[in-house]
């Protein structure tokens, strides 16, 4: 357990930051799921709309260190490829 005032404050800050990050990750995952669901349904317009919303979120969180930059790139690449394939098939 923390003995100094500084250590106690750091524990409080760490917990607050953890909860903030959990909320942000949850929001990001929700957007990814919405995009994946639109692709699965075959709705090109909804998929493109959700994709344009999720890309800046992924970039922002990658730049802030919430997720790794390669993970953001991987999500964007895979979703983009699926949307492109869906658009050409439709």
Curated annotation (Swiss-Prot):
Q: Does the keyword Ribosomal protein apply?
A: yes
Q: Indicate whether Ion transport appears among the record's keywords.
A: no
Q: List the disulfide bonds.
A: none
Q: Which GO terms describe its cellular component?
A: cytosol; small ribosomal subunit
Q: What keywords were assigned to this record?
A: Ribonucleoprotein, Ribosomal protein, RNA-binding, rRNA-binding
BP GO terms, sorted: translation
Q: Which InterPro entries does this UniProt record tie to the protein?
A: Ribosomal_bS20, Ribosomal_bS20_sf
Name a GO molecular-function annotation.
structural constituent of ribosome
Q: What does this protein do?
A: Binds directly to 16S ribosomal RNA.
Family label: Belongs to the bacterial ribosomal protein bS20 family.
Q: What is this protein called?
A: Small ribosomal subunit protein bS20
- Upper lineage: Bacteria, Pseudomonadati, Pseudomonadota, Gammaproteobacteria, Thiotrichales
């Amino acid at each position: 357990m923390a003995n100094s005032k500084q250590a106690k404050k750091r524990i409080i800050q760490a917990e607050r930051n953890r909860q903030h990050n959990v909320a942000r990750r949850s929001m990001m995952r929700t957007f990814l799921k919405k995009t994946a669901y639109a692709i699965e349904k075959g709705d090109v317009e909804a998929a493109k709309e959700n994709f344009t919303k999720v890309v800046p979120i992924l970039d922002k969180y990658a730049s802030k260190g919430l997720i790794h930059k390669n993970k953001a790139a991987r999500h964007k690449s895979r979703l983009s490829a699926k949307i492109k394939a869906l658009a050409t098939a439709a």
